[in-house]
Amino acid sequence: MTTQNQTDNQTTSRRSLFQAEFNNESLSNAEIINKRRVINGYDDGLMQVSPLKHPWAREIFKNMQRNNWVAEEVPFQKDKEQWESGALTDQEKDTFLRALAFASNLDGLLVHSLSEIIKPSITSPEVSLAIARQIYEECLHVDSYSVMIEAVGLDPEDVYGLYRRDKSLYYKNKRVWESMFKIKRHNFDTQNTEDAKLFLEACTTNLIFEGIFFFSAFLVFYNFGRHKKMPGSKEMIQFINRDEDLHVQLFVNIINEIKREQPELWTQAVQDKMAQNIVDAVQMEYEWGCSCIGDGILGITPDTLKEYIQFIGDLRLTAIGLPKVFNTKNPFPWIDEFTQGNMIEVNFFEGTVREYQTGSLEW
């Protein structure tokens, strides 16, 4: 016996799109657009973007295009000279390597999460376009870290292989991997309410990765730049940070749009789970950041690092409609000189971002 869910799946599945006989009385274009959703919507697989059902996704996609850059634009000669000349202390070198190690590991994991977990469930073509562009940008970041490693003259094993020697990084990567792929199973289907809730949780997980887990590393690189150290690395991170901020905006909009389209998913239990995941991520990022800076480095202390990560955590909570937990202020106001125009700290619901010039950090 065919269930209603099976019938619905057949009408929305790309696999069954052209299996039926031609019927010129099938859904009209307007009906197709009206049936679109971020997930569980009508999906003919033809990627017809216009007219738009989700204009915020197209806007983000266009801003991603305007941000286009390549790693070879960034000069690293000064970084190489400083690394080899003793301009950095042993502690500073260790902090630099640890920050670079996790950032490079995480971008690699994100490529898999987006392509294998998130994108297959998206049924809105304009949202799918933005996710595809994000996958490209994560690949660009992976390549950029490689360029940085080679240009500065670092041993790749010291960066990519650190998790095999460092217990804290190993377990952080392990927790990231497990949280990313908890929904990856053969019979996962967002038509099922519980699976749709898991997908919403997976989107929040990606928001955490993009919007919390990079930030102690970004802080380290910007702090080096503030002290006139490793300027090329700082510039590379500015490019990457600018991309990540749009990724954060994309997932905030995805989460909020799913809430609007399928409010039955946004139960109190789901809200509590999302909030706890963000709170746990803040603690995890703080612990990792402390392992990088030790008792403190170049003005960053464990206490100020904690305040900063908590400040970021509250931004992510409020962006998806959850209350603040930490109520801390940004203890590093100087960071604005490096992130001006690309740190997203305000109302995500407005769906607006600054426009940038291609291949430039001028805004």
Spans of model-derived segments:
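Non-heme di-metal
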Residues: 2-363
